[in-house]
Amino acid sequence: MIVFLIVGEGAEKQRIIAMARAKGLTNMRFVDQQAREKIPSYICASDACLVLLKKAELFKTVIPTKMLEFMSCARPVILGVEGEARAILREARGGVAIEPQDSRALVDAVRYFAANREAGREMGRNGREYVIKEFSRRHSAEKYIRVLEQMLNLPERRRAKIAA
């Protein structure tokens, strides 16, 4: 049986709980907001993690922190977000991207991971490696320094002295 674990709060939480009860769904578990240090244990208890946002122009430039947290815990992501987040997930080979608000695609993606656990584990590993490589503090600091150097238009020799 596929079980959905929904952790945290949100504007739609009570409506979703009521809808699940009305439909007699027994495979949904709701957990209240948790302390930040407890979140990785919930993520690691999952076979795949969902990041779903409404289809909106605004969200095309968003990179949900949840997505990076899930990837850092080596969990494959089912992503219903367009734009930058989707590009990152594809480059990382860390999950499956679906169209936002496409319930049929969501069902298919959940079923895929339920039936293909090894593929999910591989995507999870890919995502973790990508996050470590591309989003570590060291990597971010190096990118930031390069941008500053370009903005300051420092000659190559001067850059070497600063880095030393």
Task: Give residue spans per PLM region.
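Conserved acidic donor-binding loop of glycosyltransferase catalytic domains
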Residues: L52-L53, L79-V81, R90, I98-E99
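A short, well-ordered alpha-helix in the C-terminal region of glycosyltransferases
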Residues: A105, Y112, A119-K133, K143-R146
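Short alpha-helical segment that forms part of, or immediately flanks, the ligand-binding pocket
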Residues: E37-P40, P64-C73, G83-A87
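C-terminal alpha-helical cap of glycosyltransferases
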Residues: R137-A164
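Acidic donor-binding loop of glycosyltransferase active sites
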Residues: L25, I43-K60, R75-P76
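Nucleotide-activated donor-binding/catalytic signature segment of Leloir-type glycosyltransferases, i.e.
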Residues: L5-G8, K13-S41
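Conserved donor-binding/catalytic loop of nucleotide-activated donor transferases
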Residues: C44-D47, L68-P76, E91-A92, I98
